Amino acid sequence: MAKEELLELDGIVDEVLPDSKYRVTLENGVVVGAYASGRMRKNHIRILAGDRVTLELSMYDLTKGRINFRHKDANSTRPPRSGQPRR
């Protein structure tokens, strides 16, 4: 059986929910629920509200997605962190 086709879309994290789930607004204005991919959890990549992310959506359920990438650029709406760096 062939691997299913996935839609890749960009969005902005609106809200961080319990159990490492997120509410994301896509570029087209649709709000979906999402979770961090295993690779992001394994590498302890932190996702905060306001981050710009790339999602994968299944063709079968367009209300749930998997966050694959967190963009690090000036287009992110989160303010820069002040103070000393974390260790």
From Swiss-Prot:
GO cellular component: cytosol
The entry's keywords: Cytoplasm, Initiation factor, Protein biosynthesis, RNA-binding, rRNA-binding
A GO term, aspect molecular function: ribosome binding
InterPro entries found in the cross-reference section: NA-bd_OB-fold, RNA-binding_domain_S1_IF1, TIF_IF1
Record PROSITE patterns: S1_IF1_TYPE
Domain S1-like stretches: 1-72
The keyword Manganese appears for this protein: no
Gene3D superfamilies found in the cross-reference section: Nucleic acid-binding proteins
Localization per Swiss-Prot or TrEMBL: Cytoplasm
Pfam families according to UniProt: eIF-1a
Reported function: One of the essential components for the initiation of protein synthesis. Stabilizes the binding of IF-2 and IF-3 on the 30S subunit to which N-formylmethionyl-tRNA(fMet) subsequently binds. Helps modulate mRNA selection, yielding the 30S pre-initiation complex (PIC). Upon addition of the 50S ribosomal subunit IF-1, IF-2 and IF-3 are released leaving the mature 70S translation initiation complex.
Alphabetical list of NCBIfam families matching this protein: infA
Family: Belongs to the IF-1 family.
Subunit structure: Component of the 30S ribosomal translation pre-initiation complex which assembles on the 30S ribosome in the order IF-2 and IF-3, IF-1 and N-formylmethionyl-tRNA(fMet); mRNA recruitment can occur at any time during PIC assembly.
Protein name: Translation initiation factor IF-1 2
Organism: Burkholderia ambifaria (strain ATCC BAA-244 / DSM 16087 / CCUG 44356 / LMG 19182 / AMMD) (Burkholderia cepacia (strain AMMD))
Protein encoded by which gene: infA2
